[in-house]
Amino acid sequence: MKILMPYFKRYRLDVWIAMLSVIVLVFATLWQPRLLQVIMEAIIKNDQAMVFREGLMLLGLAVLGIIGGIVNTIYAARVALGVATDLRADLYAKVQSLAYADVEKFSPSNLVVRMTNDINQVQQIVMAGFQQITRIPLLFIGALILAVMTMPEQWWVIVVMMAVILGVALIAVRRMTKYFAQTQQDIENVNTVARENLMGIRVVKSFVQEPNEIKKFSAASDELTAVTAKIGYWFAILMPAFFLTANVAVGVAVYLVGQTITTHPAYLASITSFISYLMQILFAVINGGFLMTFASRAVISLGRIGEVMTTEPSMTYVDGDAAPVAGDIHFDHVTFTYPGDAQPTLKDVTFTVKAGSMLGIVGATGSGKTTLAQLIARLYDPDSGTVSIGGIDVRALPEKALRSTVAYVLQRSTLFSGTIAGNLRQVKPDAQPSHMQWAANIAQSAEFIERLPQTYDAPVEERSQNFSGGQKQRLAITRGVIANPEILILDDATSALDARSEKLVQEALDRELKSTTTVVIAEKIASIIRADQILVLDNGRISGQGTHHELLQDSAIYRAIYQTQKAREEGLHE
């Protein structure tokens, strides 16, 4: 609960009003049976004046209790909603501050559940807490004292009833806590399966995998249903057990009073009051049990939220100027292993790229091409060795300076829902239409953007479904070049373009970004044949380095790739 205290302080006035109003509600609730007892005694004595007077007081107390309950509900809801909103915003901001490796460690679907389902659990317990956390102990203690004062001989009935109810509640809470933890994990599993299916819906449709995907989702959903059902079974047992115990206690009390009514006539008026206090004690204990049950679930959710909030980013940045640095790149004996992997992905990699030149990178799948690019952009830090940009270790560069220096365009283009202009302004917030048109001309996206009715204000739908693969890649390149970066990384970013469009993009990059260092990762050698330097990666090591013509002479791997691709192209033209 420590994590919530700073949030409660932001709403201290609402907290105080919620707590004071519940005190008013409890006072009204406790005093009503007492007045009812007085009215019953007045009826027995046929004192109509007292019946009228005490009846008005009873009515006034009831109205006061209703007002207290309404005020408490309103302000408890304000606190719960405010705390949940602020906590969600801070959790989201924390996720944004984490390094790429940290986000991958939790997994995106896991973080989504924490920002939605877990926050909702916290909101519910805060709401219930400010409605019940003050009410339950005050009502319990007050009703217990008044019940004993009303019929002191029946104190043992109360003790037995409480012992039975608390025993059942503790057993249930202990069993249900582990089910609540499993529920959160199962919700994550369901979300992961659904997300993977929807993200890969084209593959599912192409290979007619709908039945298998339905089975996979059903299995995950059935696990969630089974655990939820177990929780439901315990809830189904709790309520009847509680009320059975209370009814037995009431029956015993009535029986005992009936045995002594001839010698103690005053008990006839007291029995109604005593039963009311018994029910109030029962209400307090039941609500306390349910609050404990929901609190155990909320504690699990809070722990999951706290795990993220207390995670220190594995990558930190120095403070400093946001100005970009020069575009030369140097790797000095760099070795890197992904978290959890046994073997390094890059091994003792050393090379230098001059500012304004073009570096091509080729190699088999899994050879470390994308990993190398990620180290330039500092999505990860190397295990050993240094990666330098502009003669400065990237770990010594301020984050804004690094981001203004390096633009990274991925093969799988990610565009955010909104507008085309909104996506471009993510990189250059002050981008004017002239800047957008300049960048679009380079990426060859102007031709289709300007055919759209709203041009650069055209909408980008969720997952950019209203654009083709080639259009998405060209828009991603447009976003990458709009700020005129010192280093532009194209990680197979033209794979969805036809040969003509790819050639036009390359020519425009050469013409418009002459001072920009371009790093091109490509499967096709034709995409990097003009590079000033080409790296051939093989199992994480540089097996060849030089120009296209030099590598044809010196690198067997490069030569084999080139000849294979050339033969394939010649076969297509026959």
Where are the predicted features?
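Transmembrane helix-loop-helix hairpins at lipid-water interfaces of multipass membrane proteins
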Residues: K9, V15-V71, Y75, V148-E153, ...
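Helix-loop-helix
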Residues: D47, L146-V160, K230-R304, V308-M309
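Short intracellular "coupling" helices and adjacent cytoplasmic loop segments at the cytosolic face
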Residues: K45, L81, A89-V113, N117-I119, ...
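An intracellular "coupling" helix at the cytosolic face of ABC transporter transmembrane type-1 domains
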Residues: R12, S97-A101, N117-V126, F130, ...
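Hydrophobic alpha-helical membrane-associated segments
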Residues: V24-A28, Q32, L59, V63-A80, ...
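Hydrophobic alpha-helical transmembrane segments of ABC transporter permease domains
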Residues: A28, Q32, Q48-M50, L56, ...
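ABC-type nucleotide-binding domain
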Residues: P324-E574
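A short amphipathic helical element positioned immediately N-terminal to and/or at the very start
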Residues: M1-R10, L111
